[in-house]
């Protein structure tokens, strides 16, 4: 990061660490800043609140934007994993309680975030996912919501929700269809297989693939390149919104299907969720140790 412009730490919330350039043109947001406490690197509610709070704080009103001024937001992770997806412990609890309202509130917060990221925080930001560890379920949906996915080799990526009878309902299908055919998007979702980042690159889902340890340098180079033609990249943000829009209502409609599908799951599916949670906890505690 220092090769572009020396970054300074500007924001420290409980679950994220943010480093920003002095002029505010680049923000690197690292999820799971509390990973040393043995927490699971998934979309816990407090992580989402910290992420969306920060992104809202740097979103400019139309009157605040300068013509030709392009900004960048990089989403990365302090944990070994990029993000393992939704909070399955919470899901199982809410499903057992038949609490549709709370489950929908969680899903809506996810949609609020990925929609804001996908639309470039109002249009003047290019969003980049830096995937240096596993991106599963909602973690992959987060990456897919970004304009560009930069991934290091050997990382696992996938949408395994079908293993417990569910589907990824926070943007996966909508965002995948912008990168691959509808048929391939359905295959990835319904088969639930894990892919390496190398395979995802060949499919056209990962935009930039680099060797292990070279992800940050690749993102720096990408930002430098885009900053040489800011007007073109700002225009492309607008063009994407016209030619290939992913609307908020579309995302919310799909996530309501997700909520209703989740509430119909049986005990076998919930036990599968809980086994995955235990595996995540073992991973988190091994890292914290």
Task: Enumerate the predicted regions with their spans.
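Conserved CoA-thioester-binding segment of acyl-CoA-metabolizing enzymes
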Residues: 1-73
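A structural preference for short, pocket-lining loop segments at secondary-structure junctions
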Residues: 26, 50-98, 112-128, 154-155, ...
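Hydrophobic/aromatic residues within transmembrane alpha-helices
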Residues: 75, 87, 142-144, 200
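Active-site-proximal gating segment of KS-fold condensing enzymes and close homologs
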Residues: 100-111
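Crotonase-fold acyl-CoA enzyme core
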Residues: 119-134, 145-156, 163-165, 169-229
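Catalytic cores of alpha/beta
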Residues: 138-139
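C-terminal long alpha-helix characteristic of the crotonase
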Residues: 207-269
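C-terminal extensions of enzymes
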Residues: 258-289
